[in-house]
């Protein structure tokens, strides 16, 4: 994406506007910075981790998860389109886009289901970042309590796995999760 001169073509801008929540001015500014940070036009995992660290996301496990979600075509690099779409989902996505993004983070192996083991890995990593979890009601949880509550409220069919549809339904019923998704807009 982008021509030899390092600028976005009109068609590329239109494509990205249609697949993101950024306008043409923002896309051009993002592209300029992206090309400055990565003249090759792609970001490898190490470069992505450096960018995430600069943005305040220092946990390596979380950086790996984010990289895997951004890298849609699974070629071990992130191109500009993947970067824009991932950034758009996190920062400006609709509630449904944010729910799907979060599900992709939790579904570490990409099989379409969240397991207790995957949730435990995620929450332990997040717990390291924030130290404790507090809900909107002020109630504190440790990661294992959250996992139990998470599966109790979302695993509708009781099979020990949470599908995307179960996750969507459960998320929309949980004010703590909705509040967390809103925080991503700030």
UniProtKB/Swiss-Prot annotation:
Q: Does the record carry Lipid biosynthesis as a key word? A: no
Protein name, UniProt field = Calcium-binding protein NCSA
Pinpoint the EF-hand domain residues. 40-58, 66-93, 94-129, 142-177
Q: One biological process GO term for this chain?
A: regulation of signal transduction
Binding residues for Ca(2+) 1, per the UniProt record?
A: 107, 109, 111, 113, 118
Membership in a protein family: Belongs to the recoverin family.
- Does the record bear Manganese in its keywords? no
